[in-house]
UniProtKB/Swiss-Prot annotation:
Coiled coil: none
Native organism: Pectobacterium atrosepticum (strain SCRI 1043 / ATCC BAA-672) (Erwinia carotovora subsp. atroseptica)
Lipidation (S-diacylglycerol cysteine): 27
Lineage of source species: Bacteria, Pseudomonadati, Pseudomonadota, Gammaproteobacteria, Enterobacterales
Gene that encodes it: flgH
Name this polypeptide is given: Flagellar L-ring protein
Single biological process term from Gene Ontology: bacterial-type flagellum-dependent cell motility
Length: 237
C-alpha cells in the first residue's frame, strides 16, 4: 500500500464537509437588521414621597409624574409621557449624466512618378494609399428614487436629555388575518416644536428612525427561497 492510496480516502471526508458547509452557508437565512433597537416603550418610575415640613408652600418637591401645572400647557416633559408623531416623509432624488465623443481622421499617400523598373508592381495607381478612420462614443445614465411615508404613531418619552429635549420611542402592531405589521419609531424631539394638540411632524424630529416591517405568509412570499439563495451564493457570475 502506497502513501497516495492512504491520503485519498482521508481527503474525501474533508471535501464532503467543505461542500456541506458551502451548501449550508448558501441556504442560510439573511436576517433583517432592525433600524429601531432597544425597548419600544418606557414606564415612569415610582415617585418618592417627601414628608411635609408644616409650610403651605413646599420649597422642594419630588418629581411627581401625575402633576400638571395650572398655568402651563400639558406638554410631555417626563419619562412615560405620550406624544403623537405625524409621519410626513417624502424624499425624492434624481440624477442624470451623459457624455459624447467623436473623432474623425483621414490620410492619403501617393507617388506621382514611378520608376521604370517599378512600373510593373506599382503601376496603374498601385502606389496610392488612402485611409479613413471614424470613432464615435455616446453614453447616458440616470437614476430616480421616490419614497413616501405618511401616517401617525403615538410614542412615549424614554429619556429626558440634559438640554430638555425628549428621546421618544414607540411601536405599533397591526394584525391582519395571518400577518402582522410593525411600525417602529425613535428620535429626539424638541419640546418647542410640539403643537397644542400634543403632536409633532416627523420632519422636525432629530435622529429619526422609522421602520415598517411585517411577518406572515405575505412577507415570506417576498423572500428568496433557500435553493435560490444556494445557487446565488455558489454562482461565480
Amino acid at each position: 500500500m502506497n502513501a497516495k492510496s492512504v491520503i485519498k480516502p482521508l481527503r474525501r471526508p474533508r471535501l464532503l464537509a467543505l461542500i456541506a458547509m458551502l451548501a449550508l452557508n448558501g441556504c442560510a437565512y439573511i436576517p433583517h437588521d432592525k433600524v429601531v433597537t432597544g425597548p419600544t416603550t418606557a414606564q415612569p418610575g415610582s415617585p418618592v414621597l417627601a414628608g411635609p415640613n408644616g409650610s403651605i408652600f413646599q420649597t422642594v418637591q419630588p418629581m411627581n409624574y401625575g402633576y400638571q401645572p395650572m398655568f402651563e400647557d400639558r406638554r410631555p416633559r417626563n419619562i412615560g409621557d405620550t406624544l403623537t408623531i405625524v409621519l410626513q416623509e417624502n424624499v425624492s432624488a434624481s440624477k442624470s449624466s451623459s457624455a459624447n465623443a467623436a473623432r474623425n481622421g483621414s490620410s492619403t499617400f501617393g507617388v506621382a512618378t514611378t520608376p521604370r523598373y517599378l512600373e510593373g508592381p506599382l503601376g496603374n495607381n498601385r502606389a496610392a494609399l488612402d485611409a479613413t478612420g471614424t470613432n464615435d462614443f455616446s453614453g447616458k445614465g440616470g437614476a430616480n428614487a421616490n419614497n413616501t411615508f405618511s401616517g401617525t404613531i403615538t410614542v412615549t418619552v424614554g429619556q429626558v436629555l440634559a438640554n430638555g429635549n425628549l428621546n421618544v420611542v414607540g411601536e405599533k402592531q397591526i394584525a391582519i388575518n395571518q400577518g402582522t405589521e410593525f411600525i417602529r419609531f425613535s428620535g429626539v424631539v424638541n419640546p418647542r416644536t410640539i403643537s397644542g394638540n400634543n403632536s409633532v411632524p416627523s420632519t422636525q424630529v432629530a435622529d429619526a428612525r422609522i421602520e415598517y416591517v411585517g411577518n406572515g405568509y405575505i412577507n415570506e412570499a417576498q423572500n428568496m427561497g433557500w435553493l435560490q439563495r444556494f445557487f446565488l451564493n455558489v454562482s461565480p457570475f
